Amino acid sequence: MTSSLVGSEMCIRDRYLADTGLPKERTYMTGSPMAEVLRGNLDKIQASDVLERIGLEKDKYILLSAHREENIDTEKNFTSLFTAINALAEKYDMPILYSCHPRSKHRLEKSGFKLDPRVRVNEPLGFNDYNCLQMNALAIVSDSGTLPEESSFYLSIGHPIAAVCIRTSTERPEALEAGDFILAGITTKELLNATDMAIEMKQKGVLGKPCPDYVDETVSMKVVRIIQGYVNVVNKMVWRKDQ
């Protein structure tokens, strides 16, 4: 039950879940818990002094997060992505703050890849600081799985962000269809074009729409009630336990 519950947060989940063979009668729509987490921490996020601490100004930097295995551990993808990042730094001529995971930092050091001096490799940032940086960046370039959800939430509270996903596929197609982020790929041409577009559209107010499943702030309540309501059913039908 748990895997079906957690995995059923997508708007177009029915098609995907049916393909996996999960039974419809034990699959429930919950939505993503990210909106609740962001809302619960929003005051702290907005009060963060991270820009002052690391010497950045609103709309005068690009925020980078690149840590996924396919981008870091695959040589071809790694070289393509960071060559594109260097090109981005050269084009925009502003700091690119890289919240760098230890594994990514080790990979960069081991490879000897030379980053543009404007790419500032920073220790991993905490939740509130990172989201404050997202809210104030000219653009966010990230392979994080939560970027579409965060973008949708910020759009719903009237604070859109220019979100660019450095991947070639996404588990969040409903947010892509809603126009909440741009799926850029990892080549120089793709990244530059996507970033240009994301920034221009944000500045002109050409925005997507919040994805309902990513702005629902009742997810935790629904999860608890579904679990409580179906404990006996699952015990009987799945685990074949006597009542």
Residue ranges and their predicted role:
Residues 1-7, 12:
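Single conserved hydrophobic/aromatic residue that forms the stacking wall/gate
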